Amino acid sequence: TVTGVQTCALPILKEEVQVEFLQQALDMILPKFDGFNLRMRTGVFWYYFEENGKKAPKVTEEAMFPCRFIRQNKNRNYLFRVTYYKSRINLEVFHVLTDGMGGINFLRELTYQYLRLVHPELAEKEGNKLSGDTSLSREDSFVRNYRSSKPSGFNKEKAYLIKEDKLPAGEFGVMHGRMPVSQLKKVAHGYHASLNEYFIAVFVWSVYKELLHGMSGGKPIRIAVPVNLRPYFDSDTTKNFFVMVSAEFRPQKESYTFEEVLACIQSSLHSQINKEHLEDLFSYSVSNQRNLLMRPVPLFLKNIAMRIVYEKSAVANTTTITNIGNIKIKDIYQPYIEGFSAFIAMSKGQYLKGTICSYQDTLV
């Protein structure tokens, strides 16, 4: 079985990683996280999970590009991978396990346990237990909050796609930019915008000016924006619980100003990021899963249908920009951690994506 990695998150420590302690830390915390201690099996009608039960996957030094396929039979059947490079710990996760919040939840505890092993004085103060604010909930919050009325689908209209020079097949390029959160907030608030709105508008503005050369007409520039549903529906699940909305800019005249582009992005997001619309989006997906006519359809036919849907929906967005938010670390561990960064894998038609996260006053 071949599984694509979709999320990679990495803490940067203030000292080089000692692989034997990182492996020991993973061995210790994995049994506590049922959502990671899984393997995926193929049935006649659907894929399904079962408890893995094998030893934790082997921690190795980073030697290849990130976000590669995870071959389960070469990874003790696990759907995540832990590697390291110098002072950096890498966690790569297949999105069927969890979303960005669930991944950070696991990575934070892995880092804490590693630091307690390397620095026994931390273990004396903290013990080898999970933090009180770490969730282990595996509730299916989609099903709990599902409502059957007014389901709505997803935009399938083709968006403007960036078709510049690409890296050779199999390669993956990452660029990190680091900026003070406090200064960025001042700039964004000067435009009466949130950080997310500001960054999305800057990306759209760049595409509009540099690739469309400020011309009108043509396909819309559309940005897929993951929305964490937990704050809207009182959930702390470590399962996937997010939906995608799309921030759209459709140039209908020449020479838009940045402020006009930003206003379009804000209007697009504000019309979608509300509890009722978010319910409609995930209720559409849940209703498809509950469709009694679909249940007896063999898996290979479902895979063909899903591939067609995926290819159409993939080119409905120019790119994806996800904001993991501020990564909070307990005070006692902060002196050992330099920072965090994260990124997501490429997908069909989207060869340039953005991931935002922050730690203390540094945004990456």
Identify the residue ranges that each predicted region occupies:
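Acyl-thioester-dependent acyl-group transfer interface
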Residues: 5-47, 54-81, 90, 176-179, ...
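Non-catalytic, low-complexity flexible loops and terminal extensions
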Residues: 6, 85-88, 97-105, 109-186
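Short amphipathic alpha-helical signal-transduction/dimerization elements
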Residues: 30, 107, 111-118, 204-208, ...
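Alpha-helical hinge/cap motifs
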Residues: 95, 188-196
